[in-house]
Amino acid sequence: MICSTLLAVEAAEKNGLFDLDATLPIIAVQFLLLVAVLNSLFYEPVTRVIDSRNDYIRTTQAEAQERLDKAMALTRQYEAEIGQARLQAQQVIAEAEAAAARIRSEKLAAAQAEIQAKLEAARRQIEQEKQTALEQLQQQVDAIAAQITEKLLGSAR
């Protein structure tokens, strides 16, 4: 290994660091050919694949954004419809509660009126029976008084 390094140093001293002979242009031409071949065989296809992939990503993102926008619009629409349905349901519930309260108050008023009428009828009947009982009692009192009077007058004679 040391030998090869020494040979390289001797060769460099003998010919110099850069010899301006035909090797430099040949190396330059080889480099340019290599760049051209790599460009046509590797870089352009890779660039095309990368560009097509970027295009695919852009279109996919655009489609995804459109779908997201549509989904958001549908969500807003459905939320608005749900809000309307809730309002309608609340109105129906309020109307039903009002109708139930009205029916309850009507039935309560009717029941109170019926109870009041029955109570009044019972009072009248009680008053009538009281009057009848008082009249019968008065008749019995009169009859007993007449009998007592007769007995008193009959025994006094």
Curated annotation (Swiss-Prot):
Coiled coil region boundaries: none
Listed transmembrane segments: 22-42
Keywords: ATP synthesis, CF(0), Hydrogen ion transport, Ion transport, Membrane, Thylakoid, Transmembrane, Transmembrane helix, Transport
Gene Ontology terms: cellular component: plasma membrane-derived thylakoid membrane; proton-transporting ATP synthase complex
Family matches, as Pfam families: ATP-synt_B
Main location: membrane
HAMAP family: ATP_synth_b_bprime, ATP_synth_bprime
Protein name: ATP synthase subunit b'
Organism: Synechococcus sp. (strain JA-3-3Ab) (Cyanobacteria bacterium Yellowstone A-Prime)
